[in-house]
A protein has these predicted regions:
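Conserved switch/coupling elements of ABC/ABC-like ATPase nucleotide-binding domains
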Residues: 216-222
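ABC family nucleotide-binding domain
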Residues: 3-214
Length: 222
């Protein structure tokens, strides 16, 4: 069953005669529970595509459907709520709140919604990621790999429809990168969690269930 679909997605910048096509007719489908890597060189359009998938930017034409919701039909306010509730993000630079503890960072999106967190589920995530003894720590007391584990836990905590990971190993050494990718694979399987990961690294991409290659704003392989 597909959880994510794009249809003829286009994104242009600028005006004639200097229009730049960042995305040009991108159509992809991702099934529930799939771990997909989108790979491309710098300037290929992969980051622009991630922004479209996550509702962080709107396409010039075409549409994105997540969990049967067409993002283009949501106004800005509803899109913000949908993004918070149904899409988890993992960024290269972790994006943790420095004044909040590890635990507070993990439950932060749920707290923003005024909802009660599923503590049993979250503790299962915490144990899987090896964060049990770090819950009271502030982010600046953690290594880069530990901070990325917190970011993964935060993305999983709200049980999103999809998780979007933007170069999640970009700031990590090779050993820690391997550990983070392995954790993404394990969490995808254990929680049947859909993950779409952006990367420029072929070795990292090949560890996903499937690889989609983007070149010059178009899908070259999927």
């Amino acid at each position: 069953m597909s959880i994510l679909q794009t249809t003829n997605l286009c994104k242009t910048y600028g005006q004639k005669p200097n229009i730049v096509k960042a995305l040009d007719g991108v159509t992809i489908t991702v099934d529930k529970g799939e771990f997909v890597a989108i790979i491309g060189t710098s300037g290929s359009g992969k980051s622009t595509l991630l922004h479209m998938l996550g509702g962080l930017d709107r396409p010039t034409s075409g549409n994105v459907k997540v969990d049967n919701f067409e993002l283009g039909k949501l106004n800005d306010e509803n899109l913000t709520v949908f993004r918070r509730q149904r899409i988890g993000f993992i960024f290269q630079n972790y994006n943790l709140v420095p004044v909040l503890s590890v635990w507070e960072n993990i439950i932060f999106p749920i707290t923003l919604d005024g909802k009660t967190s599923d503590q049993q589920f979250i503790m299962e995530i915490v144990k899987l990621l090896g964060l049990e003894k770090k819950l009271d720590n502030l982010p600046n007391n953690l290594s880069g790999g530990q901070q990325q584990r917190v970011a993964i836990a935060r993305a999983l905590a709200s049980k999103p429809a999809i998780i979007l990971a933007d170069e999640p190993t970009g700031n990590l050494d090779s050993k820690t990168s391997d550990e983070v990718i392995e954790l993404l694979k394990v969490t995808s399987k254990k929680f049947h969690q859909t993950i779409v990961m952006i990367t420029h690294n072929p070795e990292i991409a090949e560890q996903a269930d499937r690889t989609i290659r983007i070149e010059d704003g178009r899908i070259a392989q999927q």
